[in-house]
Structures are given as C-alpha cells and as structure tokens.
C-alpha cells in the first residue's frame, strides 16, 4: 500500500513484543521493512498492529471474508512479578476483529476475572500522544473496527491466556477510534484532576459509584500504563501496594469524607498547575488539595493550585485530595502517608512517604515465627 509511511527502508507498520529484551531495545516495537514485509504473511485476526500513513490518508484492507463468528487470540505475559512496573512486559496488543464496533464493557466483563491483569483490567488506546484508559467506570465505550488496543495479561512470567472476541460484544453504536458516551446514572459522580507543566497535560480520574470501594475494584480501577516526566495518578485509599492508578472507583455514599493520595511526577524549576478538569460531584461538597511540604490546603473548586518546585517531584506522599462538607484552611490538617509493601518475587520491602515525615521512623521486621530480624531508625 503506497500510503503507508516510510523512513528509509523502515515501514510505518509493525507489531508489539512484550519480552524484556524487545522492550529494552525499542520499547517492544518492531517495524516491517521493505525487505521483510513481502514475507510477513496475512494479518492475524485479533492481533493488534501499529500503522501510520502519509498525511493521514485512508488504508484499504482486502480479504475474502469478514469475521462473523467468535475469534480467539493467545495473549502472553512476560512480567516477572512487579505489580507496579511500567516496562510493558505485562501488556499485549490486540485488536477488534470485526467490521463493527466492539463494546469495551462487554470485553472487560468477559475477561477481568481470569485473563486480564487485576490492576490493568482495562483497555488502553493510543490517541497519538499518550495512552487513554477505558474501564468499567467509564461506560459505553466502543472500539472501532480493526482498531488495536493494549490489555494487561494476568499471570506470572510466560503465562498465556486465551482472549475471546464474541459476536455478543459487537455494537452498532460508535464513531472514531474509541467512542465514549456517559449516561450519568443516579448515584454516580466523577472528579478528574489535571496536571499541567511545560504545555503537557495529564489527567487522573476518580469515580464515585455504588459498586466502588476503598480497595481494588477489578475492572473499575485501572492502573496507569506508562509514566513519564509529567504524570499524575492516585493510590488506592485502602490496601495500597504501590500501584499507580489512572482510574479509581470509590463508594458514592462515602464521598463526603474521603482522603485520596495523589501522585505527581514533574520537573524542577518549571511552573506546575494542579486543578479540576471535570467534576460532577455535589455542589456543596468541598474539594481541597493538600500540599504536605508547603503546609497548604487549597480549595480547587475555587481555583487551581500553582507552584514552582525547587526539585523534581516523583511519587506519592506530598499531595492529597480531601473531600468534605467542612471548610478547611492551611495548617488545619497534616496528612501523613507511610506505606510499606513487598512486590511478588522481590527480595526487598519498599517504604514510601519517608520524605514527608518530620520525625525519625523506627522500622522493625519480624519473620513468620515472630522473631525480630531487623530493628533500625530511618532519618
């Protein structure tokens, strides 16, 4: 196809491999070349591919038949145990195999409990600049015909899962690559927090639903797929194991008294703006952003919080969202986040929040027999 973009012999069409070796060499992507494309064979139904054209021109696909039955695809994870790693080894690139739109809700519901990674039981779609997250908390999404998308695969290194696209997942509604409509049913509210620095805009989404809880709600909570110099995310209110969440669902009935850890990655010396980009919470619910380092409490319904950091920011423990019926002011509350967890297969324990602690932290570690094996103080 002459409309496929080229860069020398490299063609702007290729596939994704999630091994650590492939990811370290080119973020997992392999492009066909003018010498390899001729022997590449046919597209695999259900497998995703990357593609770019000259000037955004249309690409024509030809085949003898279209899929009218169920389609299966084998997805494999090469993750070695880190639940919060963002190296791409837990993801597979799949695609809608039908000539109709595919329901994200139906797809996730069919795979979230067995085949999809518990922290990543969502659909991740590339928008040309970053990955957008679609979960059960963002209802009514449709994936365009042949559109590719990333999914997290459940299991230890080398585990394969069968992904099944069924005709029942097809829908006749949708437009564009990923269509989204939001019926905003009763007992539902949304709060999106935005980070802006150097003209980069990032967003994390909080949903308040009847089925939401403070812990992990598989399919409704979705971890971030990729992090960079500019990122914003939340942490689970309960049972936090160091996983950075892009979508977090919480109980609608409990939103009047909630403190949510907020993570920020940003660079030193450049202005940062944190604010609300979308809100459907009740008008009389106050929403404050706490900066533990500065000791400030900002009403972000009234305006954004803007500052210039003196050093790079990376992680959680400094910022918290407070949702309350009360009026709060600077110095009234000082939230402290000290979190400890161990990754699967890791031979170490991660401690978070030390930078925001004003006093020394005493750490004691016991083995399964109850014997103290470590007793130390951290400054």
Model regions: which residues?
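Compositionally biased Ser/Thr/Gly- and acidic/asparagine-rich
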Residues: 1-10, 16-379
């Amino acid at each position: 196809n002459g409309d496929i973009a080229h860069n020398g012999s490299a063609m702007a069409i290729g596939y994704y491999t999630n091994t650590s070796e492939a990811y370290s060499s080119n973020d997992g992507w392999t492009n066909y070349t003018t010498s390899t494309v001729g022997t590449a064979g046919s597209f695999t139904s259900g497998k995703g591919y990357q593609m770019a054209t000259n000037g955004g021109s249309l690409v024509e696909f030809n085949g003898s038949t279209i899929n009218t039955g169920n389609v299966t695809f084998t997805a494999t994870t090469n993750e070695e145990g880190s639940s919060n790693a963002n190296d791409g080894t837990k993801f597979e690139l799949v695609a809608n195999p039908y000539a109709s739109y595919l329901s994200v809700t139906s797809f996730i519901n069919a795979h979230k409990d067995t085949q999809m990674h518990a922290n990543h039981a969502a659909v991740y779609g590339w928008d040309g600049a970053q990955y957008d997250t679609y979960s059960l908390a963002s209802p009514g999404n449709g994936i365009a015909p042949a559109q590719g998308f990333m999914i997290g695969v459940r299991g230890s290194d080398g585990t394969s899962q069968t992904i099944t696209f069924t005709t029942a997942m097809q829908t006749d509604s949708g437009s564009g690559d990923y269509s989204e409509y939001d019926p905003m049913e009763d007992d539902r509210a949304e709060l999106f927090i935005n980070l802006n620095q150097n003209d980069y805009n990032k967003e994390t989404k909080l949903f308040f639903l009847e089925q939401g809880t403070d812990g992990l709600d598989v399919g409704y909570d979705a971890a971030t797929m990729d992090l960079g110099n500019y990122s914003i995310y939340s942490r689970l209110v309960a049972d936090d194991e160091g996983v950075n969440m892009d979508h977090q669902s919480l109980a609608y009935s409990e939103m009047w008294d909630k403190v949510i850890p907020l993570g920020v990655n940003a660079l030193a010396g450049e202005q940062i703006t944190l604010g609300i980009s979308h809100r459907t919470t009740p008008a009389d619910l106050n929403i404050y952003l706490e900066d533990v380092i500065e000791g400030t409490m900002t009403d972000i319904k009234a305006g954004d919080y803007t500052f210039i950091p003196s050093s790079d920011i990376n992680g959680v423990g400094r910022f918290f969202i407070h949702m309350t019926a009360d009026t709060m002011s600077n110095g009234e509350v000082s939230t402290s986040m000290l979190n400890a967890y161990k990754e699967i297969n890791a031979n170490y324990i991660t401690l978070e929040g030390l930078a925001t602690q004003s006093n020394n932290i005493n750490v004691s570690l016991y083995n399964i027999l109850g014997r103290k094996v470590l007793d130390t103080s951290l400054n």
